[in-house]
């Protein structure tokens, strides 16, 4: 097979059909096409409207609390003895993760489109909390679909969503995790097309969602560029972020894709090890297929059926990946690694002890690979890790796993 030709720019996708190379597109029921086309038109109009961007910027500053700091992790850098490690502190955003960046954009778009009812899927609950928060702020009805397994392991976030006025629907079908929550949300959308806006939480789904979510999250990378130039007078040498669907990673990576000298690493969830089959590493252990309206790398069994994903982290427990990541993987622009549950727990503990910051289990996957990458780099190597969420939501789960080991 001929290797794909390197493009002049990695930042021009998707094409007019919503594709990144062979990935992406929109594979949806005919009943959903009017919704999708309406959304595509509305987003194109909003993007071209300076008033929409000005409103979004105002809320990002005064409600979300941006810009988030770029923090030098001095003790962690000394501990590994190689790269100079910086954290992009997305966990300091209102609601505790990067998710709010995208939700704000979509909720402002829903208001612009006159949609009073918002539905969302959630895994770890962070996207659900962000959606419930902004629905409360703007007086919109909010319904969040969440796998029954995730409802159990993310109880603090379930309570938060209910406190914010959202209806949380536990999904009992399939593996009762994120994939199944997304299936139910899509079913709801087909049934309630007239008044409902589907707020997708990651860079997946049918076009225009992967590009739209990426655009709303790209504030992370734009700020990182400005902040690193101000702090160090140059761009970082490398970027590291965890990947489930991959929105926090795409938000950090996208503004740097054409800076060829910047190494970029995405970290998938290897669960109990890719060789065990109990993992969520779609690029490492999957192959191309179609799920939730787009073509991408998926975990599948021999019959082509979607396989169950496993991760200690509810937010990475998804059997696919955003189509732009699949394309960047095939183009070789981004290096995709994976971290096991055990490596992640160790990184979770180490970050807490060295920096006084308890990370979410999701970015702890990225930190697990920093532990391998940083010592191999020279001391003037600038490495940025996207600390995409805080660990409050994970404390009960980690306490149960570690028990008296703390």
UniProtKB/Swiss-Prot annotation:
Keyword Amino-acid biosynthesis recorded: yes
UniProt pathway annotation: Amino-acid biosynthesis; L-tryptophan biosynthesis; L-tryptophan from chorismate: step 5/5
Subunit structure as annotated in this protein's UniProt entry: Tetramer of two alpha and two beta chains.
Known EC number: 4.2.1.20
Entries under HAMAP family matching the protein: Trp_synth_beta
Organism: Methylobacterium nodulans (strain LMG 21967 / CNCM I-2342 / ORS 2060)
Family: Belongs to the TrpB family.
Uppermost EC category: lyase
Residues where N6-(pyridoxal phosphate)lysine is found: 99
Keyword Lyase: yes
PANTHER family (UniProt xref): TRYPTOPHAN SYNTHASE, TRYPTOPHAN SYNTHASE-RELATED
GO molecular function (one): tryptophan synthase activity
Keyword tags: Amino-acid biosynthesis, Aromatic amino acid biosynthesis, Lyase, Pyridoxal phosphate, Tryptophan biosynthesis
GO cellular component, one term: cytoplasm
Named cofactor requirement(s): pyridoxal 5'-phosphate
InterPro entries: Trp_synth_b_CS, Trp_synth_beta, Trp_synth_beta/beta-like, TrpB-like_PALP, TrpB-like_PALP_sf
Pfam families: PALP
Gene3D superfamilies listed in its UniProt record: 3.40.50.1100
Known catalytic reactions: (1S,2R)-1-C-(indol-3-yl)glycerol 3-phosphate + L-serine = D-glyceraldehyde 3-phosphate + L-tryptophan + H2O
Protein name stated in the entry: Tryptophan synthase beta chain
């Amino acid at each position: 097979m001929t290797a794909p030709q390197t493009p002049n720019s990695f930042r021009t996708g998707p094409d007019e059909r919503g594709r990144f190379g062979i990935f992406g597109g929109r594979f949806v029921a005919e009943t959903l096409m009017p919704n999708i086309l309406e959304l595509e038109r509305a987003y194109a109009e909003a993007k071209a409207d300076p008033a929409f961007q000005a409103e979004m910027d105002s809320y990002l500053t005064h409600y979300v609390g941006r810009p988030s700091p770029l923090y030098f992790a001095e003790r962690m850098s000394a501990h590994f003895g190689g790269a100079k490690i910086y954290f992009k502190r997305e966990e300091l955003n209102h609601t505790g993760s990067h998710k709010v960046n995208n939700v704000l954009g979509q909720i402002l778009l829903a208001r612009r489109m006159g949609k009073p009812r918002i539905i969302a899927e959630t895994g770890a609950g962070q996207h659900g909390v962000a959606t419930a928060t902004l629905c409360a702020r703007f007086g919109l009805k909010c319904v969040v679909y969440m796998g029954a397994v995730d409802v159990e392991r993310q109880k603090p976030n379930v309570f938060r969503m209910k406190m914010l006025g959202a209806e949380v629907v536990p999904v009992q079908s399939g593996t009762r995790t994120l994939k199944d929550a997304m299936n139910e949300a899509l079913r709801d959308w087909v049934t309630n097309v007239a008044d409902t806006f589907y707020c997708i939480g990651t860079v997946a789904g049918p076009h225009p969602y992967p590009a739209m979510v990426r655009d709303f999250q790209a504030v992370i990378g734009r700020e990182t560029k400005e902040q690193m130039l101000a702090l160090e007078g140059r761009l970082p040498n490398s970027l590291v972020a965890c990947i489930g669907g991959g929105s926090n990673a795409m938000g950090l990576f996208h503004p740097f894709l054409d800076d060829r000298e910047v190494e970029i690493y995405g970290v998938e969830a290897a669960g109990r090890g890719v060789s065990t089959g109990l993992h969520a590493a779609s690029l490492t252990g999957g192959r191309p297929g179609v799920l939730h309206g787009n073509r991408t790398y998926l975990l599948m069994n021999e019959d082509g059926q979607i396989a169950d994903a496993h991760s200690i982290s509810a937010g990475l427990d998804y059997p696919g990946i955003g189509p732009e990541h699949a394309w960047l993987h095939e183009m070789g622009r981004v290096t995709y690694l994976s971290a096991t549950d055990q490596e992640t727990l160790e990184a979770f503990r180490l970050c807490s002890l060295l920096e006084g910051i308890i990370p979410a289990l999701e970015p702890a996957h990225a930190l697990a690979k920093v532990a391998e990458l940083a010592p191999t780099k020279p001391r003037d190597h600038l490495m940025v890790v996207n600390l995409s969420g805080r660990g409050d939501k994970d404390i009960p789960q980690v306490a149960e796993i570690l028990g008296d080991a703390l």
